[in-house]
């Protein structure tokens, strides 16, 4: 028990220590972040101020030069201007010093150049000379020296007139001096380094993102920490310059990191020591307060072995006294329970014997009832089957009657349809007979026409003969006419022969028309007889349909009665089955009751055996 309490206390102490350490860690981390941000911001501001001061100085210097050389530039004093440019370049270490006249001539520290700023439209020349404004460019890489160069240009006035321009080419590391405290790097918009402190001077002219990939994703106003090969910690931040250039400020945070680690270690050590002291004190208190647990444990073990005996009261002067008193009360209660249980078990054994006899009598009666119910159920089932057979036969007869009635109705429809078709055939035959009569009349008309044609051909033949005779009389002059007359007579003969053929055909046509008329008349008579037979057949089918309908109605009544009888017998059979089920359930319940009673007897015996476990020892 003491081990468990100490383990729980130790666990709680660890949790509290971890929680406080996490809180302190977060607090210190926040302080560290603020310190680093403050130092980075301060150093960046100092470096920006130094950069701006240098820029302002060179702007003022440029303005002073524009005043000093105004007259010389107006007069184009070549040697004097070149000498001044060289002296300024040597004194200040500029990349180049250029004086441009109004026509674009350029006087530099290396002499007068052979190209013209006005002709080439140099940006600094255009803005200072033509627009009259001061101008300084962004840092660009000089093609000659490879250095980043910033050009500052100022217009030169004589009175109110512009006579030229002064341009100073200043190296990047000259504006951003490597001297001073703190590490830094300045880059152009493409991350090319043009100025840095002495420590990082080797990076000048190189791409910072390739040399220091960590710096690429820096956001202005934030910082990133990193360590070198010697595990020395630094923090770097980025600041925008002039909207194009970037300033990377690096500060040494090794002391801040070491202070942070030391504070965390002190907190952990302090809480660990405090937890150990508390653990020792807790063990001493628990050992003293729980000294009586051993005696109570022995008492409980004796009760668990069934030993119930009187004990003298034990006093521990703490909460264990309540436990000891409760154990003493429990012992007295157990004694009463054991004695009462023995008496109850004896009475229960007697009652269970009586229950067993009653259950056996009820079981025998229920079995007899079950046999009688099964006989009634069997008879009811047979009656239900008979009713079902009658109902099926009646339904089958009714279905056959319905089928016959449908067939009769279909036959009736067919006969009606046949009668209608017969009437249509009769009408068609009448129409055909009329057409044949007309055809016979037309053939008679044609016969009269052929008679006319025959007469014409006879006359034509006669005329042709007369013409031939007259042509013969005419001699040689009538020979041509004789040929024509022969041809006409030949045509008349052919016409006469065709007329005879047509008359033969017309005669045959008239004979066939008369024969067709006779056949049509005979068909009309036969169709009339068929219609009479169809009407008689329809009357017979109607009579059969009525009889079949009566049979169907009788079958329907028989089927309904058989179905109702079947439903009643099935209901009786179902009721008998329910009664049989209930009787079986009663038998099962009695069997279960009997088994439960036997189980109770066994449990009573077991309980007596269990109660014998308690050994009662009473002092006199």
From Swiss-Prot:
The Methyl-accepting transducer domain, residue ranges: 344-580
Pfam families given in the database record: MCPsignal (PF00015)
Job of this protein: May function as an environmental regulator of TCP biogenesis. Negatively regulates the synthesis of the major pilin subunit of TCP (TcpA).
Keyword Membrane attributed: yes
Example GO biological process: signal transduction
Topology of the protein relative to the lipid bilayer: Peripheral membrane protein
One term under GO cellular component: plasma membrane
Keywords: Cell inner membrane, Cell membrane, Membrane, Methylation, Transducer
Signal peptide (residue range): none
Family indicated by similarity: Belongs to the methyl-accepting chemotaxis (MCP) protein family.
Ubl conjugation listed as a keyword: no
Protein name per the record: Toxin coregulated pilus biosynthesis protein I
Cross-referenced InterPro entries: MCPsignal_dom, Sensor-like_sf
Family matches, as SUPFAM superfamilies: Methyl-accepting chemotaxis protein (MCP) signaling domain, Sensory domain-like
Compartments in which it is found: Cell inner membrane
Gene name in the database record: tcpI
């Amino acid at each position: 028990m003491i081990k468990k309490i100490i383990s729980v206390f130790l666990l709680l102490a660890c949790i509290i220590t971890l929680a406080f350490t996490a809180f302190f860690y977060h607090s210190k981390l926040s302080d560290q972040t603020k310190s680093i941000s403050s130092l980075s911001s301060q150093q960046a501001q100092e470096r920006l101020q130094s950069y701006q001061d240098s820029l302002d100085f060179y702007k003022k210097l440029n303005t002073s030069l524009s005043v000093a050389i105004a007259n010389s530039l107006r007069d184009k004093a070549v040697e004097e201007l070149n000498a001044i440019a060289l002296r300024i370049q040597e004194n200040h270490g500029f990349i180049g010093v250029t004086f441009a006249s109004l026509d674009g001539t350029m006087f530099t520290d290396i002499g007068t150049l052979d190209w013209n700023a006005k002709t080439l439209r140099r940006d600094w020349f255009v803005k200072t000379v033509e627009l009259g404004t001061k101008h300084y460019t962004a840092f660009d890489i000089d093609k000659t020296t490879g250095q980043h160069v910033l050009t500052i240009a100022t217009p030169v006035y004589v009175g109110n007139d512009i006579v030229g321009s002064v341009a100073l080419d200043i190296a990047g590391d000259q504006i951003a001096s490597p001297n001073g405290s703190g590490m830094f790097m300045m880059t152009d918009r493409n991350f090319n380094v043009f100025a840095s402190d002495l420590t990082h001077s080797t990076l000048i002219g190189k791409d910072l993102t390739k040399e220091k990939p960590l710096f690429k994703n820096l956001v202005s106003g934030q910082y990133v920490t990193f360590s070198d090969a010697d595990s020395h910690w630094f923090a770097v931040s980025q600041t925008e310059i002039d909207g194009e250039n970037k300033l990377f400020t690096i500060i040494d945070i090794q002391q801040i990191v070491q202070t942070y680690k030391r504070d965390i270690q002190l907190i952990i050590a302090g809480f660990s020591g405090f937890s150990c002291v508390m653990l020792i004190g807790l063990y001493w208190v628990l050992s003293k307060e729980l000294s009586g647990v051993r005696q109570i444990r022995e008492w409980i073990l004796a009760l668990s072995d069934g030993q119930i005996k009187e004990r003298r009261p034990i006093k521990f002067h703490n909460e264990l006294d309540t436990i000891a008193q409760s154990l003493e009360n429990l012992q007295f209660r157990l004694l009463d329970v054991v004695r009462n249980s023995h008496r109850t078990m004896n009475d229960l054994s007697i009652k269970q014997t009586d229950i067993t006899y009653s259950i056996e009598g009820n079981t025998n009666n229920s079995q007899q009832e079950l046999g009688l119910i099964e006989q009634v159920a069997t008879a009811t089932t047979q009656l239900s089957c008979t009713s079902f057979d009658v109902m099926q036969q009646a339904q089958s007869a009714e279905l056959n009657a319905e089928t016959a009635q449908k067939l009769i109705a279909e036959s009736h429809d067919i006969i009606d349809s046949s009668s209608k078709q017969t009437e249509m055939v009769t009408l068609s035959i009448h129409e055909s007979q009329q057409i044949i009569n007309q055809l016979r009349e037309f053939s008679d008309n044609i016969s009269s026409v052929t008679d006319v044609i025959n007469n014409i051909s006879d006359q034509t033949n006669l005329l042709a003969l007369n013409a031939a005779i007259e042509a013969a009389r005419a001699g040689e002059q009538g020979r041509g006419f004789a040929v024509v007359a022969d041809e006409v007579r030949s045509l008349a003969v052919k016409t006469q022969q065709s007329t005879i053929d047509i008359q033969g055909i017309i005669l045959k046509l008239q004979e066939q028309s008369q024969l067709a008329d006779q056949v049509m008349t005979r068909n009309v008579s036969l169709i009339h007889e068929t219609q009479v037979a169809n009407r008689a057949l329809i009357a017979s089918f109607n009579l059969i349909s009525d009889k079949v309908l009566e049979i169907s109605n009788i079958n329907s009544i028989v089927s309904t009665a058989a179905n109702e009888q079947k439903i009643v017998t099935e209901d009786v059979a179902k009721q008998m089955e329910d009664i049989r089920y209930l009787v079986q359930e009663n038998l099962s319940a009695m069997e279960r009751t009997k088994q439960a009673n036997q189980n109770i007897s066994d449990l009573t015996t077991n309980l007596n055996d269990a109660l014998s476990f308690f050994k009662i020892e009473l002092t006199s």
